[in-house]
Amino acid sequence: MDSGNVVVCDNGTGYVKCGFAGENFPTSVFPCVVGRPLLRYEESLQEQELTDIVVGAACADLRHQLDVSYPVTNGIVQSWDDMGHIWDHAFYSELKVDPSECKILLTDPPLNPVKNREKMIETMFEKYNFAGVFIQVQAVLSLYAQGLLTGLVIDSGDGVTHVVPVVDGFSYPHITKRMNVAGRHITSYLVDLLSRRGYAMNKSADFETVREIKEKLCYLSYDYKREYQLGLETTILVKSYTLPDGRVIKVGTERFQAPEALFTPELIDVEGDGMADMAFRCIQEMDIDNRMTLYQHIVLSGGSTMYPGLPSRLEKEMLDRYLDVVLKGNKDGLKKLRLRIEDPPRRKHMVYLGGAVLAGIMKDSPEFWITRQEYQEEGLACLRKCGQA
């Protein structure tokens, strides 16, 4: 079977990355959104023919005329009808494949409900009639993309952040940490921060605009208190941004206040540990033989790890915790800890890249894939081939 017949599809909360096995980057990346025309626009826009359902990037251009819904929330599919439209768009419009002649590798966040996987595999066989399907945990794929089998993956996308220890290609679900703070929540927090500054932002229509502001201007401070002080006393942090309608707004301390929620989720009223705490606790809960290897291979993955300053901030926080908790303040011991944070430049599409590598290697080994025949004979029991969720 040639690589053109193996589809890789990483459906995230914010974007769908899809392409073919063995490729170096996704063929198509489009926002995971579905829009339906608002009634009042249906009559008035005769010359601009609106289809019944708009998927992906087209939603952004027409967003004032559409009722936009996001089928995936926090990594879990909430609306399977809408997800069907997204997959239709991916397979037929973007990749232009005939599913019945292809195999597909899908991804799933760790600690996702089993129902999510079951419904996914059911749709792939019943609706699209794929020849073979495999579902892999996202974190493991990120490591494959980095050429590792053992490491600690910190994956932060649009809907969910998780920290997953992987040893020899197996993840540990009982030690995996998950936090519902990621890209979408930071954008939404930035909307709040900007409205406190006096810029009225509409939650839905301006959401994309604010996301662009976030991607262009936000960063993580090395020392939050000092940076905040600097922001209050000087104007050195203020940057201007031109909105699509020509207005210019100034963004100051908000640039690092918004992403700070990744490290201190209390800022947006989410209980639990921040990214550094999760990573540290995760490694300390592993058995002692694996800890040092994990400290040396902390791999960042996903779009919300792209903030400038995030790797150095994470390193500082982890060293502080190690010094306090493990070494009880004895600094000599830090020399032995070779903490290394890997931040590959293409980490935004890391899960997809790992999927393309895995699918490329496995495309000809029948024992790897769940075949249509197995699904028809065993039903959902065939999911055991995919290992643990």
Curated annotation (Swiss-Prot):
Disulfide bonds: none annotated. One of its GO terms (molecular function) is ATP binding. GO terms for cellular component: Arp2/3 protein complex; cell cortex. It comes from the Eukaryota. SMART domains: ACTIN. GO terms for biological process: Arp2/3 complex-mediated actin nucleation. Keywords: Actin-binding, ATP-binding, Cytoplasm, Cytoskeleton, Developmental protein, Nucleotide-binding. It is found in: Cytoplasm, Cytoskeleton. The keyword Ribosomal protein does not apply. ATP binds at G157, D158, G159, R211, E212, I213, K214, E215, G302, G303, S304, T305, M306, Y307. Component of the Arp2/3 complex. Belongs to the actin family. ARP2 subfamily. This is Actin-related protein 2. The lineage of its organism: Eukaryota, Viridiplantae, Streptophyta, Embryophyta, Tracheophyta.
